């Protein structure tokens, strides 16, 4: 009887997403999952603090509407665990691993706790190879490392989600391994669109009756979207990561892990932090910001067993890259793709800032001498143009030397040539999407900086694939003129 008493507690207070539970006997360990019934629904609470007075403070993984003081809470004696393995493929789950696609239980043979240790130092793998994305500006100037961590930084509405969807289209669809997509605090509509896109593309397989099935599917989706309470948004990235880790460690696969959006993970942590009674740090963020980010990011890594290549969209509040949330994530990434509002205002998409995006693998040893030199010459031309813009704005183009005029003309062509029609945006633009191989990208840009295409008009370079298409477009423009 004593064990039953000790494993059952009572709710003593409810403050939004934070619930205090009192136990008579032994207290549940920190990070333990507690369960209670909320109007017929299972509500999971995660222990965050021991307050003394036999009370633990917990974070709710779902809405606390309808909870009452004194109602019983059961200690499960374990952490929140989510289903892992092949049965998760083709399914949509929430933070606690429950299916939300209305297709019955997941039926996985195994579950795994969402909190785990990062791989040991000795288990880490450090080979450097390029992950081809087919997107010119990325492959040329800030290439992605296979098994690396990639961050897409950008303010509101500059194209992070479209870029991540294009990367899913270009990489995940042709990728032999498994992908996991974690939707953290973003729009439910986008999650729905993505699911149907996967169905249409065959990334999620269908059975004879046309219903989605795990057999032959290549992606698992975990969602804790904008409408979810902060507890769910703060943990859903870990749930998705746990599923990805299983495929890496148990099946030795090369896994693609997409997260949209890491900032919402931080934001949810800051919402909960104040309710937990922690004193906020800079800009009102939680004092544990660096720790929370480190614990998540250090688990996303490649080991000797398999690799996780992660692409993370990171919202930049008020376009300020020095804000603590994006600034904390910079240190963990191998490549950063920064989206710039000024470039999107010019109508150049993807609105990647070629001078602000970086990559660890842009070295001659990894990409080759020709690629490296071409990338640096492109950046040099764009940088010269940037420094001349003030002079042009005040005095006009006529005051520039002939050499500078040529630099400006080439830079403007390069700027337009870095734009590219996306497959996922085809429905909006009416322009068929383009996938450009790295060799074509390097060859095309080398020719442009060498001045081989100085005779082509600027407009010919806008929204095309390789240089051959720009030449075709120039002929077409000339014919129309």
Swiss-Prot record:
Keyword Ribonucleoprotein: no
Compartments (UniProt record): Cell inner membrane
GO cellular component: plasma membrane; proton-transporting ATP synthase complex
Main subcellular location: membrane
Keywords noted in UniProt: ATP synthesis, ATP-binding, Cell inner membrane, Cell membrane, CF(1), Hydrogen ion transport, Ion transport, Membrane, Nucleotide-binding, Translocase, Transport
Statement: the UniProt record of this protein carries the keyword Transmembrane helix: no
Broadest EC class assigned to this enzyme: translocase
Pfam families: ATP-synt_ab, ATP-synt_ab_N, ATP-synt_VA_C
EC annotation from Swiss-Prot or TrEMBL: 7.1.2.2
MF (Gene Ontology): ATP binding; ATP hydrolysis activity; proton-transporting ATP synthase activity, rotational mechanism
Domain of life: Bacteria
Membrane topology category: Peripheral membrane protein
Reactions catalysed: ATP + H2O + 4 H(+)(in) = ADP + phosphate + 5 H(+)(out)
Binding site for ATP: 154-161
Signal peptide: none
Assembly mode: F-type ATPases have 2 components, CF(1) - the catalytic core - and CF(0) - the membrane proton channel. CF(1) has five subunits: alpha(3), beta(3), gamma(1), delta(1), epsilon(1). CF(0) has three main subunits: a(1), b(2) and c(9-12). The alpha and beta chains form an alternating ring which encloses part of the gamma chain. CF(1) is attached to CF(0) by a central stalk formed by the gamma and epsilon chains, while a peripheral stalk is formed by the delta and b chains.
Function: Produces ATP from ADP in the presence of a proton gradient across the membrane. The catalytic sites are hosted primarily by the beta subunits.
Family membership noted in the UniProt record: Belongs to the ATPase alpha/beta chains family.
Protein name in the entry: ATP synthase subunit beta
